[in-house]
């Protein structure tokens, strides 16, 4: 048996190939699997359940069907932090806090989306802190649909422009932040996404940091079993 992790799919109507690849993943890759964890940014953008497009409901039904075979867990990403517990429940997913610890075949493991670890990106961290304020979420949720969509488009455009000007190191996780979280959670292993830089990093004292891959050019999943850790590519169309 194994446990699977995916993240950073950025599903949208603009990329039906990714949507089809994910649906195929749900149909073909969940055999002999104890659980599936989705580590955020399942959607390219999510501005509220009331603006969910038909394809999102299609995905909700597919995920729900898969959840009848195994438990599926979801952690918010920076693109879909407004996904509600109601939508998660409708999809058969259990909504987890942004930092969560799990015993993974005897190894204490902390899992998260990963954006909170990019502490050198000061402007983004300030925005993230504001975004997570309860009153800010309430205010945004009560804006007209058209206004929320307009804000989402502008924020995405600003983010893409800003990222082009940021250095590689600023947009990656900060090693001190990784160590601090491992110590705070008393864990030996960390699994996250967000950076789109899949890798298995061996750290000091036998610790490990694993980054799941994105789904831009191909699918990607992390498979963890009792005796094997593997990042697996899933070519589109296969």
Swiss-Prot record:
The keyword Lipid biosynthesis is assigned to this record: yes
Membrane topology: Peripheral membrane protein
Cofactor binding, note field: Binds 2 Mn(2+) ions per subunit in a binuclear metal center.
Binding site for Mn(2+) 2: 41, 78, 113, 194
Pathway per the UniProt entry: Glycolipid biosynthesis; lipid IV(A) biosynthesis; lipid IV(A) from (3R)-3-hydroxytetradecanoyl-[acyl-carrier-protein] and UDP-N-acetyl-alpha-D-glucosamine: step 4/6
The protein's role, per its UniProt record: Hydrolyzes the pyrophosphate bond of UDP-2,3-diacylglucosamine to yield 2,3-diacylglucosamine 1-phosphate (lipid X) and UMP by catalyzing the attack of water at the alpha-P atom. Involved in the biosynthesis of lipid A, a phosphorylated glycolipid that anchors the lipopolysaccharide to the outer membrane of the cell.
Name this protein carries in UniProt: UDP-2,3-diacylglucosamine hydrolase
Lineage: Bacteria, Pseudomonadati, Pseudomonadota, Gammaproteobacteria, Alteromonadales
């Amino acid at each position: 048996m194994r446990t699977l992790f995916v993240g950073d799919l950025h599903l949208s109507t603009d990329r039906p190939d990714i949507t089809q690849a994910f649906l195929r993943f749900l149909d073909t890759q969940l055999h002999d699997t104890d659980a599936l964890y989705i580590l955020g940014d399942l959607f390219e953008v999510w501005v509220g359940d009331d603006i969910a497009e038909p394809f999102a409901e299609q995905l909700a039904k597919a995920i729900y069907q898969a959840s009848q075979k195994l438990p599926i867990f979801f952690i918010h990403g920076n693109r879909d932090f407004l996904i509600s517990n109601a939508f998660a429940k409708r999809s058969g997913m259990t909504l987890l806090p942004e930092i969560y610890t799990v015993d993974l075949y005897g190894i204490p493991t902390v899992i998260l989306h990963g954006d909170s670890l990019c502490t050198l990106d000061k402007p983004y961290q300030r925005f993230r802190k504001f975004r997570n304020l309860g009153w800010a979420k309430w205010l945004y949720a009560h804006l007209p649909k058209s206004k929320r969509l307009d804000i989402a488009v502008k924020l995405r455009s600003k983010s893409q422009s800003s990222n082009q000007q940021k250095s590689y190191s600023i947009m990656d996780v900060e090693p001190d932040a990784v160590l601090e979280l491992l110590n705070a959670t008393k864990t030996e292993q960390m699994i996250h996404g967000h950076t789109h830089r899949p890798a298995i990093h061996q750290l000091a004292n036998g610790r490990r940091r694993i980054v799941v891959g994105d789904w831009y050019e191909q699918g990607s999943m992390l498979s963890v079993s009792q005796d094997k850790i593997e990042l697996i590519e899933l070519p589109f169309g296969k």
